[in-house]
A protein has these predicted regions:
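Short, acidic/turn-prone active-site loops that include or flank metal/cofactor-
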Residues: 13-14, 38-40, 64-65, 127-129, ...
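Class I S-adenosyl-L-methionine
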Residues: 1-16, 21-23, 28-119, 203, ...
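Class I SAM-dependent methyltransferase SAM-binding "motif I" and its flanking Rossmann-like core
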Residues: 100-166, 215, 228-232
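A contiguous loop/helix-start segment that scaffolds small-molecule binding in enzyme catalytic cores
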Residues: 6, 164-236
């Protein structure tokens, strides 16, 4: 019996209209879907494409605690991959949903690493949060020979500072509880006035502003965009 195929589907940043046509079609056709969800409540990736999911679909839910340590999540990925493998061995295709793009800070990569050597895999790219945030602000990220760096806010200040110094365009993501510290860091290096804030990009409760407008209790799905290059078409 031929093995089933695993699809890693990017569901984009939040607005269902930003899901690609291919992703939507594959989700509509899926008999089995898998996705991550927090300890309690639905998964964000699933909520984005809820209208495309059929009523008789089998759902594999991997509930991952939102903690900094890796160990608890890895055992959950192990279990999730084993559940997916049962269907793949039976010749059934499985669609795994991942907000944004599956390979850009995407949880799908951990399942991919566990299954790619044994099963056929296809990945459908999704609109990244960085692209969505830039679009919401009408703000080009980089131009010509500029360099772009994407930084997770949990990094230590020294690491953030050194990477920011080398880049022309900067995106800082995963802000959440780190916002006060990041605000202080950017102020200390003279970039506060050049920093744009986006919360819940592409959604109905989207928040846009400058760093000064960003709440200290920022959503996890929020981002700061900075341009410190010299391209005249980007500088503002």
């Amino acid at each position: 019996m031929a093995k089933g195929k695993l699809y890693g589907i990017g569901t984009g940043p939040g607005d269902p209209e930003l899901v690609t046509r291919k992703a939507w079609r594959l989700i509509q056709q899926a008999g089995i879907i898998a996705y991550l969800a927090p300890d309690d409540g639905p998964g964000f990736a699933r909520s984005i494409v809820a209208e495309a999911i059929g009523h008789e679909v089998c759902e594999i839910i991997m509930r991952v605690p939102m903690r900094t340590g890796r160990a608890p999540a890895q055992s959950i990925y192990d279990d999730g991959a084993k559940q997916i493998a049962v269907y793949l061995d039976a010749g059934r295709d499985v669609v795994m949903l991942c907000e944004g793009d599956p390979l850009f800070y995407g949880s799908f990569m951990y399942v991919l690493a566990r299954l790619r050597d044994e099963y056929p895999v296809e990945i459908v790219a999704g609109v990244t949060s960085v692209s969505a945030c830039a679009a919401s602000h009408l703000h080009p990220l980089v131009a010509r020979n500029d360099s772009l760096v994407v930084l997770p806010a949990p990094l230590p200040d020294d690491a953030l500072r050194s990477r920011i110094e080398l880049a022309d365009g900067i995106a800082i993501m995963k802000l959440g509880r780190h916002m006060p510290r990041i605000r202080s860091l950017l102020t200390s290096i003279g970039l506060a006035d050049k920093t744009l804030y986006v919360g819940h990009a592409s959604l109905g409760n989207e928040l846009l502003g400058l760093l000064a407008d960003a709440p200290d209790e920022a959503p996890y799905f929020s981002m700061l965009l900075i341009y410190k290059g010299d391209d005249p078409w980007i500088m503002r």
